[in-house]
Amino acid sequence: MVQKKYNISVEATLEVIGGKWKCVILCHLTHGKKRTSELKRLMPVITQKMLTQQLRELEQDGIINRISYNQVPPKVYYELSEYGWSLQNILNSLCAWGDTHLTKVYGDKSSVLEESILNQ
């Protein structure tokens, strides 16, 4: 296996949590384990295919755990792994920056921010 080279450490971070949806998924999982259908309901714009792909990548990188119950119909939950919890301060900082940005751009962020437990 060829060892990958990075120019700066943030490249490694973005390789794991970069993209449009991964941080959103992780923010939702900081509020507890979720089923795929719950995550889809919380992010109605994401396609099922993209959600599944992002969850698989986060699981492969050790950021989330997939908990599968052996029953019919199958029951699967996702939760942050211990390693994933190490991203909590980063996620909190991203949310705080987003609040500041929305206020700067729109004045009243409530006019553009959907109601959610994450936005309280």
Regions found by a protein language model. Give the residues of each.
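C-terminal regulatory/oligomerization modules of transcriptional regulators
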Residues: M1-K5, Q60, N65, E82-Q120
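N-terminal helix-turn-helix DNA-binding core of bacterial DNA-binding proteins
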Residues: K5-M50, Q71-Y77
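Alpha-helical interaction segments
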Residues: V10-E11, I67-Y69, S86-L87
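The DNA-recognition helices of helix-turn-helix-type DNA-binding domains
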Residues: G32-K33, I46, L58, G98-H101
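Residues within the DNA-recognition helix of helix-turn-helix
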Residues: Q54
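Beta-hairpin "wing" of winged helix-turn-helix
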Residues: E59-E79
